[in-house]
From Swiss-Prot:
Assembly description: Forms a 24-polypeptide structural core with octahedral symmetry. Part of the 2-oxoglutarate dehydrogenase (OGDH) complex composed of E1 (2-oxoglutarate dehydrogenase), E2 (dihydrolipoamide succinyltransferase) and E3 (dihydrolipoamide dehydrogenase); the complex contains multiple copies of the three enzymatic components (E1, E2 and E3).
Source organism of this protein record: Staphylococcus epidermidis (strain ATCC 35984 / DSM 28319 / BCRC 17069 / CCUG 31568 / BM 3577 / RP62A)
Stated name of the protein: Dihydrolipoyllysine-residue succinyltransferase component of 2-oxoglutarate dehydrogenase complex
Low complexity bias (residue ranges): 159-174
Record GO terms (molecular function): dihydrolipoyllysine-residue succinyltransferase activity
InterPro entries in the record: 2-oxoA_DH_lipoyl-BS, 2-oxoacid_dehydrogenase, 2-oxoacid_DH_actylTfrase, Biotin_lipoyl, CAT-like_dom_sf, E3-bd_dom_sf, PSBD, Single_hybrid_motif
Length: 420
């Protein structure tokens, strides 16, 4: 017998929530095979068995919070003996039948119940789903899942709701996973549990707001030259780099690296009474997912070319949306860039990420009239950029200079190529 324990994840992560059991009691388990998915403050991770055998016991249920080092399952040798559970179920059913009225205990009804019990045993469902179904008298054969092979507790709960609600409210409940409260039917509301990650994000954002002297400075960038360069080079870039597209994010990433080298205070953090200035350039790129905004890091951007940065950004975005990010993708960055422009934002004051000193905000490119010299006004594609920074570390002079460096490099992309 071997216990499966929650592994060490990251220095800042001490616990997680069991999001989903991937194996049921009685399933064969290979060495190194994942048996459950754990939701942490940063990413979802799979917990694997270090031994081959049969999953003989689940020590926690879906939704339970478990700590690092805590045993969550037992993997044994050979086949699991489920006769005790089966006999207990059988005896409970027999006791229930003895208490039923004569009308309910006719042979045909009993035969029907036995058939239903056998049918439920053949259906692939999690232990929590079976317990909930037995407790509430739900026939698992009438429960439809969410597109996978295993019925789960929420599938059973949704099936219960569907029997008492209209088709419209059923669809709404299944899509949102929430519970509607109707104390005042004319003012309906929906109450739902926040996910662990959203609760953590809310806590961290509040901590940043309360524990830093955050200030934001703005500038504007004429995107004419970089857009022209991208237009001229994008087809050749795709051919030269196996289909990788040239976007604006790589330009801003390289510009940020150059500005960080010029203004190292922006690449720092406070640790107690010390200020730590980072000598590396791991740039976080904010990615929007169904679970909210995630910030994986592109490592060593000072050593990567434009194509390598674009490829890594694309790979991290796919991993984020497929919930495949690892903890190594999410920790120990030095600076973050967020692009609210993809959602149509014209201007914003982004919030600093974690222990970093600053964050760069990109926004929508909007064509508007600009005075290009004393006597000439032209329509130019313009972008507002913002730098939110911790005023305890960074003075206004450095913040303005940093943003001005970004502006100059983007407006003169040939200089940016030379910087690289």
């Amino acid at each position: 017998m071997a216990e499966v324990k929650v592994p060490e994840l990251a220095e800042s992560i001490t616990e997680g929530t069991i999001a989903e059991w991937l194996k049921n009691v009685g399933d064969n388990v290979d060495k190194g095979e994942a048996i459950l998915e754990l939701e942490t403050d940063k990413v979802n991770v799979e917990v694997v068995s270090e031994e081959a055998g049969v999953l003989s016991e689940q020590l926690a249920e879906e939704g339970d919070t478990v700590e690092v080092g805590q045993a969550v399952a037992v993997v044994g040798e050979g086949q699991v003996n489920t006769s005790n559970d089966s006999s207990n179920e059988s005896s409970q059913k027999d006791e229930a039948k003895e208490k039923e009225t004569p009308k309910q205990s006719n042979p045909n009804s009993s035969e029907s119940e036995n058939t239903q019990d056998n049918s439920q045993q053949r259906i692939n469902a999690t232990p929590s789903a079976r317990r909930h179904a037995r407790k509430n008298g739900v026939d698992l054969s009438e429960v439809s899942g969410k597109g996978n092979d295993v019925l789960r507790k929420d599938d059973v709960e949704n099936s219960q709701k569907s029997s008492s609600q209209t088709a419209k409210s059923e669809s709404k409940s299944q899509n949102s996973g929430s519970k509607q409260t109707n104390n005042n039917p004319s003012k309906p509301v929906i109450r739902e549990k926040m996910s662990r990650r959203k609760k953590t994000a809310a806590k961290k954002l509040l901590e940043v707001s309360n524990q830093t002297a955050m200030l934001t400075t703005f500038n504007e960038v004429d995107m004419t030259n970089v857009m022209d360069l991208r237009k001229r080079k994008k087809e050749q870039f795709i051919k030269d780099h196996d289909g990788t597209k040239l976007g604006f994010m790589s330009f801003f990433t390289k510009a940020a690296v150059a500005a960080l080298k010029k203004y190292p205070e922006v690449n720092a953090e406070i640790d107690g009474d010390d200020m730590i200035t980072k000598q590396f350039y791991d740039i976080g790129i904010a990615v929007s997912t169904d679970d909210g905004l995630l910030v994986p890091f592109v490592r060593d951007c000072d050593k990567k070319n434009f194509a390598e940065i674009e490829q890594e950004i694309a790979n991290l975005a796919v991993k984020a949306r497929d919930k495949k990010l690892g903890l190594d993708d999410m920790v120990n960055g030095s600076f973050t860039i967020t692009n609210g422009g993809i959602f149509g934002s014209m201007m914003s004051t982004p919030i600093i990420n974690g222990n970093q000193a600053a964050i760069l905000g990109m926004h929508s490119i909007i064509t508007r009239p600009i005075a290009v010299d004393k006597d000439t006004i032209e329509n130019r594609p313009m972008m507002y950029i913002a730098l939110s920074y911790d005023h305890r570390i960074i003075d206004g002079k450095e913040a303005v200079g940093f943003l001005k460096t970004i502006k100059e490099l983007i407006e003169n992309p040939e200089d940016l190529l030379l910087e690289s």
